[in-house]
């Protein structure tokens, strides 16, 4: 909450919100800790903690014992530092040379894989009289960022030349198909990465942290654990694949809304843009104040469901920017202001990001990450609830009588 902003009544916001259960996240973290033992854990909180809200999630994970936090961008690292986070922060995606000052000024550990990154970081460290810490990113086979494993010795020479302004404290890579235990390429990547690390050591570089294991590898590939692990999606309650061994995590985020309008339409009446759905009977239709700007994929139109009074209600017509319509004909008593579960559980039914992803031909990661910025996050913990909204400051500036 911004300085000087008072707590606002929850009903001042549109009745669409996400609940983030920080106790569930703590239990997921403990399940990972039980799996890997004393190994340090780098909790991945990039992309606004997969849509859950990076600041509050990072605070909870730091309290749970995460030694490291992983982000993609320097800007994400700066946000965490300025919010008081003290854990070590790794920039998994590296940085642009022009951001070298930002990296050092906020005590961030940068991934490096380009010579100009070393030059910029070394110059910035020299101006400050400090030592920059880096992790070398190695491409062991995923083919995106990173020094190709066979070229590690050549890059090692650049790292040695950059000492003492730059010290390599870690080396890491990323797995391409660890979510499929039958895929032999994971073993190929592990071997390639180990070979690259040995080549670094022969050049006189001895990083303390060697890491490769993502969520899938934590579950089913112990040879990839090495000296640190990097859980991502399992922190948020979703195993990366049904092909992996069972793992005791539970979804952290629920997405909820309320019915704001109900009407009965006659057979032959169409709904929404493009008239993609037409009633074939007398139908009760409920309108929900949630749309694709809030994160619902348009592909859910005429495919997906929500839960109303613990029962599935089909989405009818196209998802609009701000509105979604559902058929509640078969749900007796469904009425105005009823709570609607978009993601979550009710009445023994569960709708998860995995189910929504299947309807939308995508993956749970995308469903979670696309949750809209205008959706308030309500953080639930033992100490109560905390509401975080992009509109908080604007609403708090209203005359006091308006918000009380």
Pin down the residues of each PLM region.
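Active-site-proximal beta-alpha core segment in soluble small-molecule metabolic enzymes
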Residues: 9-12, 16-20, 24-27, 34-211, ...
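Active-site anion/phosphate-binding pocket segments in diverse small-molecule metabolic enzymes
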Residues: 1-26, 30, 34, 40, ...
């Amino acid at each position: 909450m911004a300085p000087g902003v008072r707590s606002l009544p929850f009903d001042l916001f549109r009745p669409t919100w996400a609940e983030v259960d920080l106790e569930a996240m703590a239990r997921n973290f403990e399940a990972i800790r039980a799996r890997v033992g004393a190994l340090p854990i780098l909790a991945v909180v990039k992309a606004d903690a997969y849509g859950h809200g990076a600041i509050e999630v990072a605070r909870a994970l730091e309290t749970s014992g995460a030694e490291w936090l992983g982000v993609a961008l320097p800007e994400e690292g700066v946000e965490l530092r300025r919010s008081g986070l003290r854990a070590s922060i790794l920039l998994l995606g590296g940085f642009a040379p022009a951001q070298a000052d930002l990296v050092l000024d906020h005590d961030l550990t940068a991934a490096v894989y380009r010579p100009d990154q070393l030059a910029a970081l070394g110059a910035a460290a020299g101006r400050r009289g400090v030592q920059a810490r880096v992790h070398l990113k190695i491409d062991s086979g995923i083919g995106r960022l990173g020094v190709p494993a066979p070229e590690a010795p050549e890059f090692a020479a650049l790292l040695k030349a950059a000492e003492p302004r730059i010290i390599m404290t870690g080396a890491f890579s990323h797995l391409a198909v660890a979510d499929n235990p039958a895929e032999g390429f994971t073993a190929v990547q592990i071997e390639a990465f180990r070979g690259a690390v040995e080549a670094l050591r022969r050049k006189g570089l001895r990083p303390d942290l060697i890491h490769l294991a993502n969520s899938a590898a934590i579950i089913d590939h112990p040879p990839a654990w090495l000296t640190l692990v990097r859980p991502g999606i399992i922190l948020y309650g979703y195993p990366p694949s049904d092909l992996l061994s069972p793992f005791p995590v539970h979804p952290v985020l629920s997405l909820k809304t309320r019915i704001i309008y109900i009407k009965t339409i006659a057979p032959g009446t169409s709904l929404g843009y493009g008239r993609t759905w037409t009633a074939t009977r007398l139908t009760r239709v409920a309108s929900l104040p949630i749309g694709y700007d809030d994160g619902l994929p348009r592909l859910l139109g005429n495919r997906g469901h929500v839960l109303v009074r613990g029962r599935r209600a089909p989405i009818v017509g196209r998802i609009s920017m701000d509105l979604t319509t559902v058929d509640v004909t078969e749900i007796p008593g469904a009425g105005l202001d009823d709570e609607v579960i978009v993601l979550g559980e009710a009445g023994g039914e569960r709708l998860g990001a995995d189910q929504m992803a299947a309807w939308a031909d995508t993956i749970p990661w995308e469903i979670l990450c696309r949750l809209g910025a205008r959706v308030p996050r309500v953080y639930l913990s033992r100490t109560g609830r905390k509401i975080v909204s992009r509109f908080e400051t604007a609403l708090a500036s209203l005359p006091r009588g308006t918000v009380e």
